[in-house]
Amino acid sequence: MAVTPIWPAGSDVNEQGEITFHGRTAESLLNEFGSPLYVIDTDDVRARATKFVKSAANAFNNTVTHVSFAGKALLSKEICRIVTESGMLIDTCTMGEMRIALAAGVPGRRLVLHGNNKSDAEIELAITEGFAKIVVDEPNEPARIAEIAKRLGKRARVMLRVTSGIHAGGHEFVSTAHEDQKFGVALLPVGADASKLNVLDDLADVTPAGSNARLGESEATPGESAERQLQYDIKYPYDMSHEKVSEGDRQLAEAMTMVADGPALAVLKEIYRHQDVLELVGVHSHIGSNIHDADAFIQAAKRMMLLRKTFYATDAYTLPEVDLGGGYSVAYTDGEDSMDLDTELARLADAVTAVNRALGMPAPVISFEPGRWTVAPTGVTLYRVGTVKPVQLAGTAKDKAGNPVTERVYVSVDGGMSDNIRPALYGSDYTAKIANREGSSETKLCRVVGMHCESGDIIVNEVRLPADIQRGDVLAVPVTGAYGRTMASNYNQALIPAVVAVSEQDAHVMIRRQTVDDLLDWDVSE
């Protein structure tokens, strides 16, 4: 049983008050593998990966689902094997990530290449290894991929990343579907009235023609009527009085015409033009990160389905797949919200089914890319406590609950922003517990800080810890399985900690600790 719901499934507290991982105490892990230390419950990784794959399939039971693990969250050969054995593909976005996954024995057909600035070498490797998808991120990229594929005598599978205009995610840096950022191609032309897309919200109220409806059948659905309107509008854009259509159909036709004029459709046409060497497999949308419910996913999905419908109307090609990206939230502190996966995926599935039926389109393959959700709660970072320094505060100081405070204890540990940059970069909140003993019942307001020459070197901004916390204690910070090791740095020439895999079977090093010799070997100056 986990220490609390935010801790790894294999964690517990023994009779002595020590935190354990599959029976191994935190103290024993530090003694064997060193401090600081990333601990990953690999049994929990496997369970969570399997859970997402099954939940997606259950929710979207009228179509095929694919789930890819976002390798940027945590990547090693062992993690690659675990998630692929659990039914996932793996998203990569650099040569390093690609080579690690391939070295783990993952076949190219289980890999995806993302990236807003792919090198020719990365594209060539993806094509040579037969990657499941190369996600196009900008208008000039299809021609580059086509040229490389032609030179290699192969056909590349490609998908277009679209910025839907739906904003989600807690911090600006992790909200990725608004137009003013580096990823993807915009759905709508500059200056377009996005409110016209609100017609999609009414489609679920229309009597559907059925999920397998095809265009051209005897009884037209609203989507078919709108398609005829769209085809006419493209030919005669200034006259909409040629036939009597309902207001809803007219609004849908206007929305489709607007999408038809957008950059995304133009890039889809460019990809399709190279169909001798490029296989167009679908569209991709990633709206942000750490999102608590399906609302924004639903809006983005509706827009992707409208793009899919519009491309069918203009080019008679049905995009096989729609990738809805990642961003599914986890709780970082006790009491914090996290996504109810089954409930929210069911809501998303209902919305996707309804809009496709109303548009008269067959259901596409639906894909997801959970990274944080898969591994964040499986990881804990262990530190050794050093300096413990009480600081007197001004009379106006308050804690985050609004209570007046006169003292804060600064608890310094032997790591910091070099092994967890997220608090400094995003203002992310974490919690902590003494892991080697029970501690006193009396607590004090503490701030856990690192060892770096930086005032922003904060690991946990505010937490109540036992008043008797002291030098030499082991401090555990949970929910660090995602973006701890992968965003680690050598700031102040600190050594990046080891990653240890703990399971019912054993505890072993997954990624070794850096050494001073590594730093000296990299420095080749005289």
Language model features with spans:
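A charged N-terminal "starter" segment
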Residues: 1-157, 172, 192-215, 221-250, ...
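Active-site loop/helix belt of alpha/beta enzymes
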Residues: 2-3, 165-392, 465, 492, ...
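Conserved, mostly hydrophobic/aromatic
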Residues: 45, 72, 94, 126, ...
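Active-site-proximal loop/turn and secondary-structure-junction residues that shape catalytic pockets
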Residues: 73-75, 96, 117-119, 138-140, ...
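The start of beta-strands in P-loop NTPase/AAA+ ATPase cores
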Residues: 89, 132, 156, 281, ...
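Hydrophobic residues within beta-strands of alpha/beta enzymes
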Residues: 90-91, 111, 134, 283, ...
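Solvent-exposed alpha-helices and their adjacent loops that cap or buttress functional pockets
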Residues: 103-106, 127-128, 150-153, 175, ...
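Charged (often Lys/Glu-rich) extended helix/loop segments that serve as interaction or gating elements
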Residues: 353, 357, 361-526
